[in-house]
UniProtKB/Swiss-Prot annotation:
Residue intervals on the Stromal side: 51-134, 213-219
A Pfam entry, by short name: PsaL
Transmembrane regions: 135-155, 192-212
Entry annotated with the keyword Plastid: yes
Name of the protein in question: Photosystem I reaction center subunit XI, chloroplastic
Amino acid sequence: MAASASPMASQLRSSFSSASLSQRLAVPKGISGAPFGVSPTKRVSSFTVRAVKSDKTTFQVVQPINGDPFIGSLETPVTSSPLIAWYLSNLPGYRTAVNPLLRGVEVGLAHGFFLVGPFVKAGPLRNTAYAGSAGSLAAAGLVVILSMCLTIYGISSFKEGEPSIAPSLTLTGRKKQPDQLQTADGWAKFTGGFFFGGISGVTWAYFLLYVLDLPYFVK
């Protein structure tokens, strides 16, 4: 009985294993139900995507000045341009080698001279015969108000006898003389120069427009 059962058991075992293998290796079918024809000679290719670090370094357009974020300023193609640096260094407020009094006179002359035109053309008496006088007086009054504001700022920001609060190092680390404008005495000189220059600019504009009677558009 055992001898006759063993061939039957081996036959059943082989049939079960072949059936399970055929189920696992079932040929896939398409949408129409027809099986896909897999050619045994067809080679399937594959590729792998890898992220490779570039050897070329990238440059930031905007970065902290001198690479130090604690300075609180950014270096851009505009602010770090030699042309912009040359222009700013020639403005009166940034010419640290010039006396604060002369810097104030220069700034005041420009403001006083160019303030007359808007007050003459846009003032309340622009359509009367007193437009020139009223506009010049209004410009002079604005110069006085600005001078008072500069005085208030100097009193609240600088203390008498204290050294300049301006930095003594350039952005490249070179030593320089601190700007004397950032002191109480220097700011007082700048304010006085601004007042004198502003009144002089208003007077000069009025003289050119209404004394010499030059053919300017703002008349």
